[in-house]
Amino acid sequence: MAAAAAALADDGDGIVDRAMWLACAAPNSGRLPAVGSMVFYFVDGHAEQFCQFPAPLLEQLAVPGPRVFLCTVAAVRLRADALTNEAYADITLDPVADHDVPRLLPAPAPAAAAGGQQQQLRYFVKTLMSSDAEYRDRFAVPMDVAKDVFPPLVDAKAVQPLIVKDLQGSPMTFDYGRNGNRVTLAKVWKKFRDDMDFVDGDSVIFMRRRDDDELYVGVRRQRTLDKPLRTRRSRPPTPLPVAVQEVIAAAGRAAAGEQFTATYRSRQDGDEFVVPREVVEEGLRLRSRFTPEMEVEFVWALEDGAPPSVGPHGKITAIHDTTWMWRSVEIGWTGGSEMNKYANFWQVRLVGSDDFASAAPPPPLSPKRLKSSEQCPSRPPEPLPGRVFLCKVTAVRLDATRNELFATMSLIPVARDQAIQPQAPADPGPSSPQVQTTLVSFVKPLTCTDAVKNRYRFIVPKRETAMGVLPQLQLNEHVPLYIKDMHGKEWVINYTWKEYTHMLSSGWIKFANANRLVTGDNVVFMRSMDSGERYMGLRRTLKPEPVSVDEVIEAVWRAARLEPFEVTYLSRQDGDEFVVPCGIVHNALRAKFTPGMVVNFVWAVEEDRLPNVGPQGKVIAIENYATSIWRMIQVEWPSCAGMNRYVNFWQIREVLGESSFEASTCIVRSQDYSPAPQRNLVNALQLPDGTKQLQQNKKSVSSSSTFRLFGKKMTPGVPPRRDTSGLSGQVSLFSHYLPHDEDDGQVPTMRQRLETLFPDNI
């Protein structure tokens, strides 16, 4: 049976073997299934072979549903089209009934000859431009590209005959010569070009087999043919291998459980519609991680066990809950990529993650899906305790990535029966003085003009804005400005004043390019009042990169086991603190919010200052989530505010005069604050209204002490769930958990749930 299966794998026209077929396929596509393996057949992908948007066509033609089938590969025959000279594969599939589905086993190993054939084939590919396809009577390619495929020239100044066969075995004799550092094919090239009717974007593939030393030429068409091809006079017309009738017939036979054959020609990246079962099922496990606004990268799975090839990056714009799963992830690719904006969930992975469908571990499953420890061997099999944890802060470390500051917080979960009271941090002794840097700063958001049109210079907003930060200049004066970034690197930038405009000129473009500044990024200039040194930092407009999904998953499960863990916090959005002092949370329980109430957003700031009052809005709904207290209150803000409409109850307070202030003290009572004018380096890099400043700069706190954060005593912290409305960062998918009442199976009320966290304070 093994010999028969191997024979079926490459049983075709006798010329096209597996190595030649892969050479003619799209560069990062063309994965052929192994005979005898379990695969999923996607009807929509099959229809894509002749139609860019197959779903409406399939519905119009009444293709019977469903449109995805689990099958066994019965045969793979490799052929070449007589009209287009393209290699394609006829894949014969046997549908598998639901009751016949076996346990998931590893796919059969490809035949040993496959790897040997690929090593015995040398080839190069050239994509034809308009001059190659329409005007030139000869084919030219750099000598370095063709030296391993074309034979060496006997006489560099003369031409010699070169016999090349097409994929049907028909020989063509070219005039083979040299022109400078390029080799050329003439004479027969014009006839071959006319017979193939090349268009701009088509590719030709020249191949040489080492065993017989014969040359072959194949063609890869750009996606679909825009016009019918002219037929060679010496050959009868042959219809295209993929037709509408074939797709309809294949879908009907698959639905009836009958064997069928599908034609696959690889023209674009990631167009495989016969996908190994294990790849799809692993991708299904990873699918729950994806949410809009996440940054992902396209990943191609290659042949012969090769590691996956990483493609362009992009951001998820939408996830479509399509019935048959085909191309359900919509992605906005960066860098002008021509990739299809609709991708399959097994073809993408999160940026910075090693997870991919063919080799990715399963993500942590929800309590409803945790049926045995075998499903997630590295995770606890018991139900998770909830989405919020009472913790003690043991350390806060400050660092920078690409000149943007972030904080790494070390937390130790506290069991409910060991709840601790907030304690004041120990006063530093005389041997460990606390260093506080006084800074003056200003911030400028980069417009399109700053980031694109005039990126060779930086316009200072106003002279008064930079006063105290940048040096004073006279008209037409320019001085070198020595300024350090957040990594300590010193930059020398020319600072000048011309025609009432202060600007940074020479040297600025180096900083902008090194940090890849884009429209919407904020540049923060700071000057130390003590040392006089100047600093330059950034606040990015894109999603945080230091925070990976793996980090959040690990934090959730370590917190569930009451083990120490670390979280990364990067401040880019107002009110996005997910580690909140317990005193702030239980003080907020005094508030009584109702729909229609007018409230202010209030930012809690560092250094015991008065809270900053933000925009005014109206409460329109109060959610009572079963397992979370994160962003429970929905507020209608003015359109100009740009605020997230879902807020936490400790972030708002009732507007004075509308109702009693004492009943809605959501952050901290005002008498708990005293103004402090100093601002440190971390404060300057935070958002304009002072949300989330860290008081201690690069200081670790011992486990026996507490830490002052947001101007409050911070011993335990509560990291709740991030918002999923599109304004959150990468931690919006996996969040922390809240206790359930497991005795009676009922979901406790919000106050009951908080009482379990703060039993002595409520």
UniProtKB/Swiss-Prot annotation:
Residues 359-381 are annotated as: Disordered. It is found in: Nucleus. The keyword Transcription regulation applies. It comes from Oryza sativa subsp. japonica (Rice). GO terms for molecular function: DNA binding. InterPro entries: ARF_plant, B3_DNA-bd, DNA-bd_pseudobarrel_sf. This is B3 domain-containing protein Os07g0183300/Os07g0183600. Gene3D superfamilies: DNA-binding pseudobarrel domain (2.40.330.10). GO terms for cellular component: nucleus. Keywords: DNA-binding, Nucleus, Repeat, Transcription, Transcription regulation. GO terms for biological process: regulation of DNA-templated transcription; response to hormone.
